[in-house]
Amino acid sequence: MASSMISSGTVATVSADRPAPAQARMVAPFTGLKSSSASPVTRKSNDITSIASNGGRVQCMQVWPPLGLKKFETLSYLPPLSTESLAKEVDYLLRKNWVPCLEFELEHGFVYRENHRSPGYYDGRYWTMWKLPMFGCTDSSQVLKELEEAKKAYPQSFIRIIGFDNVRQVQCISFIAYKPAGF
């Protein structure tokens, strides 16, 4: 108890005469992460206006309109991809050594829960596979050729391209490559 009452000047003179043990140096008690003996700190209010730190950019954010615009797969917020953009996406999945695969859906190409009701990534849709996965595919033009065949066979369907990792046995990428007219 007496050691906690020593002033810092007394400790300095004791230290000059002989080395002080580590326990002789007292530190002020801490409250949370800040010292209670530190200089006065200004406290910020935690109201809703102090949370956003991006200032004026908050006003330019937009909300996806839920009426009239369906949410599709990855990249669905972009305009329809051109043939060149699709080729670049397919080249990307080929560089990652993923197996390209095409799937199509005749009725619901958008997020729709039919067979599974819980929230999360899995939305209960089952798409039909177009032919077989393209094992050994090395060129995006092969995938785009199959995409054109699928469009001719099912012009009113949604068609997506999937990148499948056959080592980890997971689907790594999936995006809509074709939407029927009116979507």
Curated annotation (Swiss-Prot):
Entry GO terms, CC: chloroplast
GO biological-process terms attached to the record: photorespiration; reductive pentose-phosphate cycle
SUPFAM superfamilies: RuBisCO, small subunit
Transit peptide: 1-59
Compartments where located: Plastid, Chloroplast
Signal peptide limits: none
SMART domains (alphabetical): RuBisCO_small
Keyword tags: Calvin cycle, Carbon dioxide fixation, Chloroplast, Photorespiration, Photosynthesis, Plastid, Transit peptide
Xref: InterPro entries: RuBisCO_ssu, RuBisCO_ssu_dom, RuBisCO_ssu_N, RuBisCO_ssu_sf
A Pfam family per the record: RuBisCO_small
Gene Ontology MF: a single term: ribulose-bisphosphate carboxylase activity
Gene3D superfamilies (alphabetical): Ribulose bisphosphate carboxylase, small subunit
The keyword Chloroplast is assigned to this record: yes
HAMAP family xref list: RuBisCO_S_bact
Misc remark: The basic functional RuBisCO is composed of a large chain homodimer in a 'head-to-tail' conformation. In form I RuBisCO this homodimer is arranged in a barrel-like tetramer with the small subunits forming a tetrameric 'cap' on each end of the 'barrel'.
Function: RuBisCO catalyzes two reactions: the carboxylation of D-ribulose 1,5-bisphosphate, the primary event in carbon dioxide fixation, as well as the oxidative fragmentation of the pentose substrate. Both reactions occur simultaneously and in competition at the same active site. Although the small subunit is not catalytic it is essential for maximal activity.
Subunit structure: Heterohexadecamer of 8 large and 8 small subunits.
Family to which the UniProt record says this protein belongs: Belongs to the RuBisCO small chain family.
Name assigned to this protein: Ribulose bisphosphate carboxylase small subunit, chloroplastic
Originating species: Malus sp.
